[in-house]
């Protein structure tokens, strides 16, 4: 399992470097890889397991590890189980695995209600004094995204070349 995951992450990283895949997704894969390493070490006292040992019980145990040891909520668990499912698909497609352990496993994402800042809360955020320059930078970046509608992921990839003070060029 971990060998498949490691190779997947190496290939994915090359695609990120080529601009074909998102860096944020790679970070998620790397995080899940680390959690799986820790899970295997703690629960099974091994560094890797054979693909044929992937069972619905293994997946449920990993889910419980994420909930209890890592204190993940349902939607984070769902987000972290998806890359494991991707590794299973890779194994099935390469005929390294003949059955899908996820066939008997189900986790549903919970519906979340997003809250929004009021104009007054935004004003307080804009005018508030923060403890240090780093907090002020994060506040300013948040406000930039809030006022422009730019996503955090897009803002993270923003470069000086993307910013124009006028559009006559």
Language-model regions, residue ranges each:
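Structural motif corresponding to the C-terminal cap of alpha-helices
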Residues: 12, 16, 37-44, 66-71, ...
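N-terminal DNA-binding recognition helix of tyrosine site-specific recombinases/integrases
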Residues: 24-25, 31-42, 49, 57, ...
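A short, basic/aromatic helix-end/turn motif that makes direct DNA contacts
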Residues: 157-163
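Basic, Lys/Arg- and aromatic-enriched nucleic-acid-binding interface segment
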Residues: 74, 78-82, 97-152, 156
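Short, aromatic/basic-rich helix-turn unit that serves as a nucleic-acid recognition element
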Residues: 2-32
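Short, intrinsically disordered, charge-balanced linker/junction segments flanking boundaries
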Residues: 1, 163-169
């Amino acid at each position: 399992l971990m060998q498949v995951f490691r190779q997947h992450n190496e290939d994915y990283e090359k695609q990120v470097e080529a601009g074909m895949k998102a860096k944020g997704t790679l970070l998620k894969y790397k995080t899940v890889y680390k959690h799986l390493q820790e899970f295997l070490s703690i629960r099974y006292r091994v560094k890797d397991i054979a693909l044929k040992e992937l069972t619905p019980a293994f997946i449920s145990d990993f889910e419980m590890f994420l909930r209890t040891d890592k204190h993940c909520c349902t939607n984070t668990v769902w987000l972290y189980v998806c890359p494991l499912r991707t590794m299973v698909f890779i194994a099935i497609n390469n005929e390294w695995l003949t059955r899908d352990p996820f066939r008997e496993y189900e986790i549903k994402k919970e519906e979340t209600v997003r809250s929004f800042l009021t104009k007054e809360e935004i004003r307080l955020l804009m005018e508030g004094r923060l403890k240090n320059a780093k907090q002020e930078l994060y506040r300013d970046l948040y406000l930039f995204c809030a006022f422009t509608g730019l996503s955090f992921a897009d803002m993270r990839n923003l470069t000086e070349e993307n910013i124009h003070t006028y559009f006559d060029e």
